UniProtKB/Swiss-Prot annotation:
Gene: Llcfc1
Positions of the UniProt region annotated as Disordered: 39-64
Function: Sperm protein required for fusion of sperm with the egg membrane during fertilization.
Keyword terms, alphabetized: Fertilization, Secreted, Signal
GO terms classed as biological process: fusion of sperm to egg plasma membrane involved in single fertilization
Organism expressing this protein natively: Mus musculus
Protein name, as recorded: Sperm-egg fusion protein LLCFC1
């Protein structure tokens, strides 16, 4: 086989492998997200509408009576920042893994 033919086969194999890895990673993340959404729905079904109203009122009352309302807002912002950082880290790790695999295939 010529070097050009070998390079074409290597490039085709690498492309197919990268596509499979990307699809697998996206599929796993989709399954995790859908499973967590299903769990949230079942938990919401368990709590009746009257209980929800009482819980919201109690949480608001406790937060305002103890002066923790600003702390709750900060906690929500902190959770958003943490989740964004985790998402970015996941994407970077996936990208690094794909580049490492590509470099291994290139030097084979």
């Amino acid at each position: 086989m010529t070097s050009l033919g070998s390079q074409l086969h290597r490039a085709t194999f690498l492309t197919a492998l990268l596509l499979l890895l990307l699809l697998q990673v996206k599929g796993v993340k989709t399954l995790i997200v859908s499973a967590s959404l299903d769990g949230d729905k079942s938990q919401k079904d368990k709590v009746s509408s009257e209980d929800q109203g009482e819980e919201e009122y109690e949480e608001h009352f406790e937060a305002s009576s103890e002066g923790e309302q600003w702390q709750e807002i900060d906690m929500v912002q902190q959770e958003d920042t943490i989740s964004q950082a985790i998402t970015l880290q996941d994407h970077l790790l996936d990208l690094a893994f794909c580049f490492n695999l590509a470099s291994i295939m290139f030097f084979l």
